[in-house]
Amino acid sequence: MDFWLYKQAQQNGHHIAITDGQESYTYQNLYCEASLLAKRLKAYQQSRVGLYIDNSIQSIILIHACWLANIEIAMINTRLTPNEMTNQMKSIDVQLIFCTLPLELRGFQIVSLDDIEFAGRDITTNSLLDNTMGIQYETSNETVVPKESPSNILNTSFNLDDIASIMFTSGTTGPQKAVPQTFRNHYASAIGCKESLGFDRDTNWLSVLPIYHISGLSVLLRAVIEGFTVRIVDKFNAEQILTMIKNERITHISLVPQTLNWLMQQGLHEPYNLQKILLGGAKLSATMIETALQYNLPIYNSFGMTETCSQFLTATPEMLHARPDTVGMPSANVDVKIKNPNKEGHGELMIKGANVMNVYLYPTDLTGTFENGYFNTGDIAEIDHEGYVMIYDRRKDLIISGGENIYPYQIETVAKQFPGISDAVCVGHPDDTWGQVPKLYFVSESDISKAQLIAYLSQHLAKYKVPKHFEKVDTLPYTSTGKLQRNKLYRG
């Protein structure tokens, strides 16, 4: 298959691919820049690299350049601690990290995009096609594409089953998991999203979710497959985002529930040009749904995973009006079912489709992930008689705070290493702003300084993972077989 960006440069070259409000790149511009950079990246002789990047045009150029150079990209969550980043990258044998943000990480070759020069200049200069720096182009049907000469040609096609990106996820026990996402996975996800949500070449999608998350990267993939425009934004600011919605003909936007709430508080009381507001990352409250629908906002709730390359369940406004607790119906190109449903129809959600990863890169010895071709999500769900899917527990003990997944096992492991703590468990605590925040229960025979404990945890965990609530207890609830009864702490 032709590289999607190459195809768009040929067929849709003058259409705006990406804009940050200051600079805009057509698909021709984007392909030109990515191709030039790709030739330089090849000199590093890496088949897999880490990316430590922000939401910027230069980051998007870097992503496409890596793919044009046949380099797999391992996305790094910029909120992680150096130790967490190191463990992730070493587990998948990454030796070199390209970055658009300052980074110091021992044990790796760190290369800033600002330091990569090609054809006598820096990538950060906007290179238009009338200044091609020695690369020859030919014109056909008013579209300018590189001539295919041995001295400058890059691969313009790829194998759908090659790994495009790698992201890390985790269960609540055990090590972090490396998820390989192939071009086929991304393509199937984009097609499923187009059918269930809807977008076309005239779409103008505001993307403020981090590119290192699948929710952010998937917008870029949908754009380059379909040929629409992405309005990239690095930081969420409700006032600024609302101004963009009003003034820049934004048709689509991806948000987590809390950011939608902030936008409504800021004054998003009508849709303007918005056709779709795609929500995910945390549960929607019935109150928020009611308020949004009263404003005629086109909200679409969704459910997806890193392993499924973003959403595979989508609820339309009509579905949410009928049943506010639903995450909708599956995309047409996936199949879902409930494993071992109880008398209420609740059981583990299983999914099968081309959007689903094949196997974890790390650890390599995981079992029980697939059953007869179906991926076991580990989420407790129900499918009603109309086909609506309800998620009741997202991996049960997984904490979702402001769209970020927080894994209790990591917090508990660090807490148990603090002097004086003999046992600890972390659960989600309700929070009006973030949905949930971590709460740590711990057992200790001595007095523990909360300030010292927080300082210790902050040394080993990303800031958003540090518990916001603490409670000292005499014992933790275990069954006779030694299984921790987290549900008693949720109620407690």
UniProtKB/Swiss-Prot annotation:
It catalyses: 2-succinylbenzoate + ATP + CoA = 2-succinylbenzoyl-CoA + AMP + diphosphate. One of its GO terms (molecular function) is o-succinylbenzoate-CoA ligase activity. Gene3D superfamilies: 3.30.300.30, N-terminal domain of ligase-like. Keywords: ATP-binding, Ligase, Menaquinone biosynthesis, Nucleotide-binding. The keyword Flavoprotein does not apply. The keyword RNA-binding does not apply. It is an enzyme of class 6 (ligase). CDD domains: OSB_CoA_lg. Its EC number is 6.2.1.26. Transmembrane segments: none annotated. Pathway: Quinol/quinone metabolism; 1,4-dihydroxy-2-naphthoate biosynthesis; 1,4-dihydroxy-2-naphthoate from chorismate: step 5/7; Quinol/quinone metabolism; menaquinone biosynthesis. GO terms for biological process: menaquinone biosynthetic process. GO terms for cellular component: membrane. InterPro entries: AMP-bd_C, AMP-bd_C_sf, AMP-dep_synth/lig_dom, ANL_N_sf, ATP-dep_AMP-bd_enzyme, MenE. Belongs to the ATP-dependent AMP-binding enzyme family. MenE subfamily. Converts 2-succinylbenzoate (OSB) to 2-succinylbenzoyl-CoA (OSB-CoA). PANTHER family: LONG-CHAIN-FATTY-ACID--COA LIGASE (PTHR43767), NONRIBOSOMAL PEPTIDE SYNTHASE PES1 (EUROFUNG)-RELATED (PTHR43767:SF1). This is 2-succinylbenzoate--CoA ligase. The gene is menE.
